[in-house]
C-alpha cells in the first residue's frame, strides 16, 4: 500500500541518481512511496507502473533494470535496488532506505 514519505533534500543531489533521466528519478522516488517500513515492496512491474506512472508510456521493467545496476560514483558501487525472490514471490529492496 502506498505511504506518505518525506524525502531528504540530498535525495535530489545524489551523483549516481542525477546521471539518469528524470523518468528514472521519478521511478526511484515512487518506489520509496510504495515500500514498507524496511524499504521492501512486491516486484510487480504492471502494478508499479499503474501506481507510479498511471498516465505515461514508460517501460518500467527497463527502469527497474537501470536501478539494479552498480552505481558509478558510490565507493561501494552498490545498486539503488535489489530484486530477489522468496519461494514464488518476487520483491524489491531499496538499498539505502533506512539510512
Where are these regions (language model features)?
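Positively charged, structured surface patches that bind polyanionic biopolymers
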Residues: 1-86, 93-99
Amino acid at each position: 500500500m502506498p505511504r506518505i514519505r518525506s524525502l531528504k533534500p540530498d535525495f535530489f543531489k545524489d551523483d549516481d541518481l542525477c546521471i539518469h533521466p528524470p523518468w528514472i528519478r521519478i521511478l526511484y522516488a515512487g518506489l520509496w512511496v510504495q515500500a514498507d517500513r524496511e524499504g521492501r515492496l512486491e516486484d510487480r512491474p504492471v502494478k508499479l507502473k499503474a501506481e507510479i506512472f498511471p498516465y505515461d508510456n514508460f517501460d518500467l521493467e527497463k527502469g527497474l533494470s537501470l536501478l539494479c545496476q552498480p552505481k558509478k560514483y558510490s565507493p561501494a558501487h552498490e545498486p539503488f535496488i535489489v530484486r530477489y525472490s522468496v519461494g514464488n514471490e518476487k520483491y524489491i529492496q531499496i538499498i539505502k532506505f533506512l539510512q
